[in-house]
Amino acid sequence: MNISDVAKKTGLTSKAIRFYEEKGLVTPPLRSENGYRTYTQKHLNELTLLRQARQVGFNLEECGELVNLFNDPRRHSADVKKRTLEKVAEIERHISELQSMRDQLLAMAESCPGDDSADCPIIDNLSGCCHHKAQKLR
């Protein structure tokens, strides 16, 4: 198979496939006499794994580890499960951080009258300025 065939079958662009090759994330393809890359089913499997792992949040380094596990006949499913659960925990931490940010933004929005006044508690809060609050207290 050539690179365009692999791109169609994996849903990756030719550029992405070359990038993964340059990063050493997939087994290097053989070269035909004319210098074109020749891919096998193994390459399809590795590239599909990379695409799907990226879609669920694994970074490039983690994807490389998953490809190595894929190619290791002595791998243990416990290793794959451990990495997957670590990724879940990381995503849960990120979700928690995002929810906290959302709560802070909503609290700021609720404190703002949203009228034609130049005074804005949101700007005051974000800038650390208490000018707005000091005027209200007087």
UniProtKB/Swiss-Prot annotation:
Protein origin, superkingdom = Bacteria
Show the domain comment.
Answer: It contains a N-terminal DNA binding region and a C-terminal metal binding region.
**What does the record note on quaternary structure?**
Homodimer.
Domain HTH merR-type, which positions? 1-69
Gene for this chain:
cueR
Return one GO MF term: DNA binding
Tell me the PANTHER family matching this sequence: HTH-TYPE TRANSCRIPTIONAL REGULATOR CUER (PTHR30204:SF16), REDOX-CYCLING DRUG-SENSING TRANSCRIPTIONAL ACTIVATOR SOXR (PTHR30204)
Q: Which residues bind DNA?
A: 4-23
Q: What is this protein called?
A: HTH-type transcriptional regulator CueR
| Presence of keyword Glycoprotein | no
Q: Which UniProt keywords apply?
A: Activator, Copper, Cytoplasm, DNA-binding, Metal-binding, Transcription, Transcription regulation
Q: What does this protein do?
A: Regulates the transcription of the copA and cueO genes. It detects cytoplasmic copper stress and activates transcription in response to increasing copper concentrations.
What's the chief localization of this chain?
Answer: cytoplasm
What InterPro entries does the annotation carry?
A: CueR, DNA-bd_dom_put_sf, MerR-type_HTH_dom, MerR_fam
| Gene3D superfamilies in alphabetical order | 1.10.1660.10
An example of a Gene Ontology cellular component annotation for this protein is:
cytoplasm
Q: Name one GO biological process term.
A: positive regulation of DNA-templated transcription
Q: Where in the cell is it found?
A: Cytoplasm
Residues noted as binding Cu(+) in the record, renumbered to the chain: 112, 120
Note the PROSITE patterns from the entry.
HTH_MERR_1 (PS00552), HTH_MERR_2 (PS50937)
